[in-house]
Design a protein with these regions (language model features):
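Terminal connector regions
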Residues: 431-468
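Residue-level detector of functionally pivotal "anchor" positions at catalytic/ligand-binding pockets or at interdomain
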Residues: 351-374, 463, 469-475, 575-598, ...
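Intrinsically disordered, low-complexity Pro/Gly/Ser/Thr-rich segments with frequent PxxP/GP/PP motifs
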Residues: 405-435
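Loop and turn regions of beta-sandwich accessory domains that flank beta-strands and are enriched
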Residues: 116, 125-131, 141, 280-285, ...
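Extracellular/secretory-pathway and virion-surface proteins
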Residues: 20-367, 372-377, 388-391, 456-458, ...
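Short glycine/proline/serine/threonine-rich loop/turn segments at secondary-structure transition edges
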Residues: 157-164, 314, 431-440, 532-539, ...
Length: 677
């Protein structure tokens, strides 16, 4: 084990020298850890020693598929710092006897260090299989081995514990294969806004819910904490999720309940334990029921933490804290419910800065996977600014652009209080000089509150890596409506935010193909679904809700091929693209996973999608149920993906067999010709 630790130690400094700025230290905690069964995956990690200060500490958790593939279920994964309390405990176990005359029962003591868990962050795995029920009804396929998604957590307040040698635990609460975990920490040197002088756990786990009295007494009882000397402020962090599904209450996974944070016996803070944006998470589409709203979590996303300022209640030498959940009743015999809870309290010393504004992150342009909904970008710039100090932040100039290129300056005004943030949408940058591949984008704050500068200039600037949106050659839009067309709308906006093309008056089960001609520039295409369930979802197919299936959307290159394909997209499908001769590559052409025939049932026109196999020509046969050939089409090229439209309005209303053949491949599907539309 000593050799492993030395290797990790050396890896840290190589990364720092070659990849990151001089004031940033990278430490790898887990590398390709295979989470394949319900257990704790521990790794001893060497962090910086005492004496260093860090203004920001981030933890990056990269989730991927295990070597055997991704699991098909939504499991929670906790990242915990296992703090050695200095105490020692032991267990007593009976050993098998080796003496029968007389009988001797021996015992053994297992001595171990007492470790206290501090939860740094939590995520819920996506449904990694069952990705295409039309093609794989038994869920035999999932994300491929290259799939990864990175989650970022701000763990700055855990600085006193991220010292010397510490065990970092990836706690996988799954019961099947599996996911991989890569965890790294990023330490950015400097003074934090307020130094942490003590960290105390309020709750470290949840439990089953039988009734309100049982849960509050056994799982989340009120606790009294002593306030450390020299404390000037304090804050509580809460992570809470609901699980299980009682048939009477739908709790805890599918019921929206409030939870209350009490201070000294009085409710002071309230939050709704509910996520309604699961149809917009960055990891989609998924198998499973990923679109449903849930109790403060979504499959394929990190669990959002809640923070509450306790400073106004720091009177005396102790404080009583308590968490309560809105009461509900479970039906007897209807299944169990539970809530996973962790809560930590941070006690701080005096502030280091009286006035400190920061750029917290750049959402667009960026290659960071949490912002994939807005990237790759060529349009408006999206940044997040934060006020770290108690003095209100009311204005600032923002300078931004391609690093090394022409910069643009805009003015932000608002009124941000202590630790409040604002997402700022800015006009497009000057993209002159952008190149193919990865570029760097810079944004910085100037003259916040009309001052020359704030007291902490180290966080006034943020740099992101990005790739400019791809170029589209002349294209056409293909939209096949499902049975709920009133839920959908299509818009294309230019870089000024002006709508230059739109369509929303769709008819049910009708396919639209329209050429789109635009002047040179940057554009955003947005397809929305008011019910946040896309155009086609396997759940509706299995439950017989066919009016919400069989929709499809494609961006087709007029010369052949497909730029974009989607049908299961939840709330929206958003993409940026460039028209013209900017120095960016053309968008890669995609291929469908298989042949597709739609709409089905058909009322007169049948569209047949043939993937690009580049194997000569394809042929299509339409036969009746007795095998009699009704129609045939030959010599369909397969160098690129093609959609072939067939008029079947002259056929009688009946069931037909459509067979598509390409070389040694063939695809057969039943199609219903119907006269009812």
């Amino acid at each position: 084990m000593k050799n492993i630790y030395v290797l990790l130690f050396l890896t840290v400094f190589v990364l720092q020298k070659d990849t990151y700025a001089e004031d940033t230290l990278q430490i790898i905690a887990h590398e390709k850890t295979q989470m394949v069964w319900h257990r704790n995956y521990d790794q001893k990690v060497f962090f910086p020693t005492e004496g260093s200060q860090y203004r920001k500490i981030y933890m990056y958790f990269t989730l991927g598929c295990a070597d055997g593939g991704c699991s098909g279920w939504d499991y929670d994964v906790l990242t915990q710092l296992m703090y050695n309390t200095g105490a020692i405990d032991s267990s007593v176990s009976k050993l098998d006897t080796i003496s029968e005359s007389p009988l001797v029962v021996d015992t053994t003591w297992n001595v171990y260090d007492v470790l206290e868990p501090y939860e740094l962050g939590r995520l819920i795995t996506p449904y990694g299989t069952y990705m295409d029920f039309r093609k794989y009804p038994n869920g035999t396929q999932g994300y491929d081995s290259s799939w990864k998604h990175t989650f970022r957590y701000d763990v700055t307040d855990y600085a006193p514990l991220l010292k010397d040698s510490v065990i970092i635990r990836a706690k996988y609460n799954g019961w099947s294969d599996g996911f991989s975990a890569d965890i790294r920490f990023e330490f950015i040197e400097g003074k934090p806004q307020r130094p942490v002088i003590a960290i105390k756990n309020l709750y470290t786990k949840g439990g089953g819910y039988q009734n309100s009295t049982q849960f509050e007494n056994d799982i989340i009882p009120a606790k009294v904490m002593n306030i450390p000397l020299h404390t000037t402020s304090a804050q509580a962090k809460v992570l809470i999720t609901g699980h299980g599904n009682n048939s009477g209450s739908n709790c805890g996974e599918f019921c929206d309940k409030d939870y209350y944070f009490k201070v000294n016996g009085e409710p002071q803070f309230l939050h709704r334990m509910w996520r309604q944006d699961c149809g917009a998470v960055p990891v989609r589409p998924q198998g499973g029921t990923y679109l449903y709203s849930r109790a403060n979590w979504c499959p394929g996303d990190k669990v959002h933490e809640q923070r509450w300022e306790l400073t106004p209640f720091l009177q005396g030498d102790s404080i009583e804290l308590d968490l309560d959940i809105e009461a509900y009743s479970n039906q007897s015999g209807g299944g169990g419910s539970s809530h996973n809870i962790s809560s930590t309290v941070f006690f701080y010393g005096p502030d280091n800065y009286n006035f400190d504004a920061e750029i917290n992150t750049i959402m667009a342009p960026s290659t960071f996977s949490e912002f994939i909904n807005y990237n790759p970008s060529c349009g408006e710039v999206i940044i997040v600014i934060k006020n770290n100090a108690h003095a209100p932040l009311t204005s600032s100039k923002i300078v931004y652009g391609l690093q090394g290129g022409k910069m643009r300056t805009e003015t932000w005004t608002g009124n941000l209080g202590f630790e409040e943030m604002d997402t700022v949408f800015l006009p497009p940058a000057y993209w002159d000089g952008v190149s193919a591949g990865t570029n760097q984008f810079i944004a910085r704050l100037l003259t916040p509150n009309k001052r020359y500068q704030d007291e902490n200039t180290t966080n006034d600037q943020f740099v992101s890596k990005f790739e400019l949106a791809p170029r589209w050659e002349p294209f056409r839009i293909m939209f096949s409506a499902n049975g709920m067309p009133q839920e959908n709308a299509l818009t294309i906006t230019n870089e000024k935010g002006e709508v230059v093309w739109e369509k929303s008056d769709f008819e049910a089960n009708k396919t639209y193909i329209e050429d789109v001609s635009l002047p040179n520039g940057c554009y955003e295409l947005l397809l929305t679904d008011a019910n946040e369930d896309g155009l086609d979802w396997w759940v509706y197919r299995q439950t017989g809700q066919t009016n919400r299936t069989n929709g499809a959307f494609r961006i087709l290159k007029q010369g052949g091929g497909v730029y974009a394909i989607t049908s299961d997209f939840g709330r929206e499908f958003r993409t940026n693209f460039v028209v013209g001769q900017m120095d960016v590559p053309e968008a890669p052409l995609e291929a469908s996973s298989d042949f597709e025939i739609y709409p089905n049932p058909s009322f007169g026109k049948l569209n047949i999608l043939i993937p690009g196999f580049d194997e000569g020509f394809a042929s299509i046969e339409i036969n009746d149920l007795l095998g009699k050939q009704i129609k045939t089409i030959t010599s369909i090229p397969t160098d690129l993906e093609h959609i072939t439209a067939i008029d079947i309005s002259d056929l009688s209303n009946n069931m037909y067999i459509v067979k598509v053949s390409v070389g040694s491949r063939s695809f057969t599907q039943k199609v219903l010709k119907s006269g009812i539309n």
